[in-house]
Amino acid sequence: QSGSREVLARVGVALKFALCDGVMYTLDANAALKERTLSGEESELMTGVSDFTLDATGKALLCVTQDGVVSFGIQTGQSEMLYTGAADQAAMCGQALLVRAGGSIVRVMNGQMATIRRDGATCLLVYGQKVIELTGRGVMTCDVNGENATTIANGSYEAASIANGVLYLGGADGYTQSVSL
């Protein structure tokens, strides 16, 4: 594609970033979650964060810490512990909080916790009402209850990203496969 590029921010080492309403959220190598506005103002929101996911619908950042999963309201600045325990990743799927912990996927909804998948998940993504997990055997989708599981790609992948209804899969050599969702 042709077009011009513009440097929006220089953040040093960013392990992960997300954009919402003109604000960039970054997780740096020191486990600090920061926000940077388009005007260049930067502030530290939380420390001790190992991963985060933007919940654009709920206007919150789901932050994985050593204690569990914290929801940080990006408009209110309020924090709320949503899940206590070991966690590697977190994402919202409708009203359910999904947590990847030790290869399993746990659903938290209405105060009730249930393990919905035990596939050795290495990555958790959500697209619409689909739960997507990378495992050593392939890429699986299921519903929020862990039912209707389907393998959509065979093989082992290290990374996944979703854009415009397409799941991109890859590893050390970059993104090598795509699957329409």
Predicted regions, residues:
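Short loop/turn segments that connect beta-strands within the blades of beta-propeller domains
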Residues: 1, 20, 29, 38, ...
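Residue position within the beta-strands of beta-propeller blades
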Residues: 25-26, 62-64, 98-100, 131-133, ...
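Blade-level signature of beta-propeller repeat domains, shared across WD40, Kelch, NHL, RCC1
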Residues: 156-181
